[in-house]
Amino acid sequence: MTKRAFLFAGQGAQKLGMASDLYAAYPVVKETFDTASRILGYDLRELIDSNEEKLNQTRYTQPAILTTSVAIYRLLAENGIIPDIVAGLSLGEYSALVAAGALSFEDAVALVAKRGEFMETAAPAGSGKMVAVMNTDPSLIEEICQQASEKGVVTPANYNTPAQIVIGGEIAAVDYAVELLKEAGAKRLIPLNVSGPFHTALLESASQKLAAELETVAFNDFDLPLVGNTEATIMKSVDVKALLARQVKEPVLFYDSIATIQEFGVDEVIEIGPGKVLSGFLKKIDKTLPTHNVEDQASLDALLNA
């Protein structure tokens, strides 16, 4: 019996027209988008298909990716493909909560629209930067970030793979950390095109607003295990609100989360949502783990015929 993990895509994976073929072909996908549009008060499908500028603004990106991901999840469930364990990268954690039965889709849509707004306000475009540091010892990166903190906020934000760690924070501090990392022998440092320095202390105000918002939402018990980003452990219902509030300002422990999923005995991973970013990380973490992604009709067919 296959033990299957679903991984849900995070911000940055969005693209114009994502899942438009699935929307046209499957009622469950269309219904999911229609529900989201009703809650948001604008036509989400139209925005995804025709307004790239808005699609890349955090307050719109987040409900767009969540809705695309949950629609694909529901389509897979209709085809009898269901997970034994779930996780999501940052924003993707909200899709994972829906899949795990802990959060209604309607509440998730309203919540991530607010989350996107809070994050945009806390870290407006141009207020900070993020840089991927390749093939460098994680403890050296942590040490150098601490050193560079004399210039402002800079910390590891995403532990994507053991060979790719993203640092983020205030521009002067990140630039200084990059300088120190180069002096220490780091060869590949890639500035990222992101809306803001997410998963750093600069998101403190967003974290506080989100904590207040989360108090108004009812969470249910989990139907299946979910590995959370912030501690890379299986989330307990009692901790969900606190962990989600922390998640926006603390690093994402992605490769540790994958280790937890592997301890669960998973032998197949399906990435859900636009792009193949997480599948790419997985290949770097453990290339023996069978991985699929589902984002459109072609990738759905490939999975169903595998």
Predicted regions and their residues:
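FabD-like malonyl-/acyl-CoA
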Residues: T2-L140, R188, E268-Q297, A302
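Alpha/beta catalytic cores of group-transfer enzymes, especially the acyltransferase/condensing modules
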Residues: G12-A13, G101-A242, R246-V248
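Non-catalytic positions within long, well-ordered alpha-helices that form the structural scaffold/packing
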Residues: A77, K182, Q262-G265
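Glycine-rich phosphate/pyrophosphate-binding beta-alpha loops
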Residues: T61-P63, P197-F198, P251
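Short, flexible segments with low predicted structural confidence
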Residues: R4, F8, I48, V153, ...
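Residue-level signal for well-ordered alpha-helical scaffold segments within enzymatic catalytic domains
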Residues: R74-E78, E143, A212, T260
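Cys-dependent protein tyrosine phosphatase-like superfamily
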Residues: F219-G228, K241, R246, E250, ...
